[in-house]
Structure formats: C-alpha cells, structure tokens
A protein has these predicted regions:
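Helical "substrate-binding/catalytic lid" subdomain
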Residues: 1-72
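Long, low-complexity C-terminal extensions of enzymes
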Residues: 64-66, 70-95
Length: 95
C-alpha cells in the first residue's frame, strides 16, 4: 500500500512542483494549474485513471513530444522525467 501511495501521491505532488517551476520560470502563477489538478483528481472518482489519461503521450503526438523535449533541453532531469513518463503513459494506453 505504501509503495502505491508513493506513486499516487508523493510522485504526483512532486510533478506539481516541477510544473510550477516551469510556469514560474516564465513569470506565470503556478496556481493557474489548480483547476486542471482538481479536474484530473475528480475524474478518477468516475472512471479509471487509465481511462482518464489524456495528452500527447496517449495520442503519441510526436510533434508535441519533440517540441516539449526541446523546451526542456536546459534541464536534463525534467527532460528525463518527461521522456520516461511519456513512454510509460503511451505503453499503458495501448493495453
């Protein structure tokens, strides 16, 4: 249970931190993500997380993925996390 909670809560919270850093670097208030965060969390009450997953990795939108990886060129850690998460999302969406 603890390991699952680390993935479902601790890691997700850290992704909020990373997303906030990306916005704040551009002078954008990270609180703008709150409606999306709330909507995403609410969806899993009505459908599985797998069914609720959206985004370029699910669609395998290679143009968007490559553009966003390029935007992360100066931050290898975020770039690696983005690539690994995108790959995992894509693999799970095919199942």
């Amino acid at each position: 249970l603890h390991l699952a909670a680390v993935f479902a809560c601790n890691f997700v919270n850290h992704l909020y931190v990373l997303g906030g850093e990306l916005l704040e670097k551009e002078g954008i208030d990270a609180r703008l993500l709150l409606p999306l965060i709330d909507e995403t969390a609410a969806k899993v009450h009505d459908m599985s997380p797998l069914a609720a997953q959206t985004g370029p990795a699910v669609r395998y939108d290679e143009n968007v993925i490559q553009k966003q990886l390029a935007q992360l060129e100066a931050d290898p850690t975020k770039r690696e996390i983005y690539a690994l998460m995108s790959q995992s999302i894509h693999q799970h969406s095919k199942s």
